[in-house]
Amino acid sequence: MKVLFTASVMGHLTGFHIPNMQYFKDRGFAVHIACGPGDTPACADRHFVIGFERSPFRLKNISAYRALKKVIRENEYDIIHCHTPVASVLTRLAARRARKHGTVVIYTAHGFHFYRGAPRLSAFVYRTVEKWLSRHTDILITINGEDYAAISRYGFRPKLGAYRVPGVGVDGARFHPHTAETRRAVREQNGISADAFVLIFAAEYNRNKNQAMLLRAVSLLKDSIPNILLLLPGEGPLQAEYQRLAAELSISQYVRLMGYRTDMDMLLAAADVAVSSSRREGLGINLVEAMLTGLPVVATRIRGHADIVQHGETGFLVPPDDAPAMAEKLLKLYRSPELRHEMGQKAISAAQPYRLENAQAETFRIYERALDMKTNRAGGK
């Protein structure tokens, strides 16, 4: 028995799908992966390096398609699980013949590229492509309510049906409420004053994550909250631009672009409020992590965020790109430590369905359904 996992980059597979690979490994499957270069995880028996390009319009994806089709033809997989937009398109195209011979193809949409508020032309194109490809998909998995509803709304037809799971899951043993002592220690280690009002948003510095909105919100709050501090762990192409914007807004001393961090579980202990300025998300795992530690949230009202944040209960949702609205809600939380605590406690409870063990249980049940389908197909030969 063989299973293939595909994604554009290795980091996606190693960051989110090791438990899924291990599920098959424990059941005697040979686990193969097809993605970009990187260190092969221990649970993978073979790694096929495929040069997927992030843009679907790059000619190099033709070579990626041919290489992937060859891998699928030669290995006769029982199950293929594809992730990330371009890799999932090419995988389903390359696996069409394999499906006729019994291969079960699973596709997880980590956020459709047609979404409420998307440019109309691009939404139409992506929706049309996804609808056509659904005919070449056995199981379609979504991670938020808007995407799940879109499947029936637009007439997608995956052979075995569609499912909604609570994302890839967050490790509750790692992300949990911290003691006051830990909070003090983390602040001291990171040079953060004890009385600072700390906001945090961990994300790549790019247009979609839209950290410029947060910088503008801080500029509106610096007089009302003179001890405000915005922590931005991450890296990306807009780092220099955001540094310039902070300087132009005269808020450099209130903002820290921290670079890539591997200690987010501890860094969250230093924060008072988790924020997100994203324009598009599949789910918003960074917010789940923050909520599990007991932080209230102020985030943009978009797909994914609306699944996680209960407006007025676990935090607040504001219109995308509306820095004044963001500032207003942050000021409200700043002025009421009691409200922050109350919302933070509710956030812990609201985030429980997104814990790793719960997300895995849902995904594993889908795998069992796929294995049953595989058995039935084999029996029908």
Regions found by a protein language model. Give the residues of each.
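Donor nucleotide-sugar binding/catalytic pocket of nucleotide-sugar-dependent glycosyltransferases
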Residues: F48-V49, K131-E181
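A short helix/loop element that forms part of the nucleotide-sugar donor recognition site in Leloir-type
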Residues: A67, H176-I192, L339
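A short, well-ordered alpha-helix in the C-terminal region of glycosyltransferases
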Residues: A185-E188, A325, K332, L339-P353, ...
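Conserved donor-binding/catalytic core segment of Leloir-type glycosyltransferases
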Residues: S193-K209, L215-V218
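Nucleotide-activated donor-binding/catalytic signature segment of Leloir-type glycosyltransferases, i.e.
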Residues: Q243-G259
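Aromatic "clamp/platform" in nucleotide-sugar-dependent glycosyltransferases that forms part
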Residues: Y260, R279
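Short hydrophobic beta-strand element within catalytic cores of glycosyltransferases
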Residues: P296-A299, V309
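Conserved acidic donor-binding segment of nucleotide-sugar-dependent glycosyltransferases
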Residues: H311-G312, F316-A323, K332-P337
